[in-house]
Design a protein with these regions (language model features):
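Short regulatory "switch" loops immediately downstream of catalytic or recognition motifs
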Residues: 1, 23
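A generic structural signal for short, solvent-exposed coil/turn residues
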Residues: 17, 35-37, 158
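Internal, conserved structured core segments that host functional sites
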Residues: 124-168
Length: 168
C-alpha cells in the first residue's frame, strides 16, 4: 500500500498546488512532465464542473476519458470530495457504496444515474491508520456523492475499480 509519508506528501501537494497558488491544470501538467517517473499512481485533481457533465457528451467529459487512457488503470481509487461535509475526518468503509444525488433542480436523467463501484473496507481501514494521529472514522452510510461519481463514470464507465471516499 501507499506509505504514510507518501500519502501525506501527496495530500500536501494537492493542497499546496491548488489552494495556495494561482496554478491551473495546464501549469500542473507542465510541472508533472518534470517529475521523475515512479511505479506509484499519479494524484489527480479533477473538478466535475456542472453536474450535467455526468450525462452530457462534450469536450469537458472527453478530457476525462482521455486521462483514463493515458494513465495506468488503478487497482483502487481514493476520492477526496468537496461535497462531503463532516465534523471530523471520515472514510467510506462499506462494500457497496450507494450513488448519492446530492443536488436539486436538474433533469430526472441525472437522478437516474447509478455508479455501482464496489467499496474497499480494508483500504478504508488502512487509510485511517496511515493518517494517524489524525482521527479518521469509518463511515458506513454516505456512499459516493456527485463530486466522485460524475467524474468516475467517464474515467471508468464499467465501475470495475473499488472506490473509497475521504472527507477532510
Amino acid at each position: 500500500g501507499l506509505g504514510k509519508k507518501d500519502l501525506k506528501i501527496h495530500l500536501t501537494l494537492i493542497h499546496f498546488t491548488f489552494y495556495k497558488t494561482k496554478m491551473n491544470l495546464n501549469d500542473l501538467s507542465n510541472i508533472s512532465d518534470n517529475f521523475k517517473t515512479t511505479q506509484k499512481m499519479p494524484v489527480l485533481f479533477l473538478g466535475h464542473g456542472s453536474p450535467m457533465n455526468a450525462i452530457e457528451e462534450n469536450i469537458f467529459v472527453q478530457g476525462f476519458r482521455n486521462i483514463s487512457k493515458e494513465i495506468p488503470k488503478p487497482n483502487v481509487i481514493i476520492c477526496i470530495s468537496a461535497h462531503w461535509f463532516t465534523n471530523g475526518t471520515f472514510v467510506t468503509a462499506m462494500e457497496l457504496p450507494k450513488t448519492i444525488h446530492d443536488f436539486g433542480g436538474f433533469p430526472q436523467a441525472l437522478f437516474d444515474v447509478q455508479y455501482l463501484a464496489k467499496g474497499n473496507p480494508e483500504l478504508a481501514r488502512e487509510t485511517a491508520e496511515l493518517l494517524s494521529p489524525v482521527l479518521v472514522e469509518e463511515d458506513h452510510n454516505w456512499g459516493l456523492d456527485h463530486g466522485a461519481w460524475s467524474v468516475l463514470r467517464h474515467l471508468y464507465p464499467d465501475a470495475d475499480i473499488p472506490v473509497i471516499q475521504l472527507s477532510i
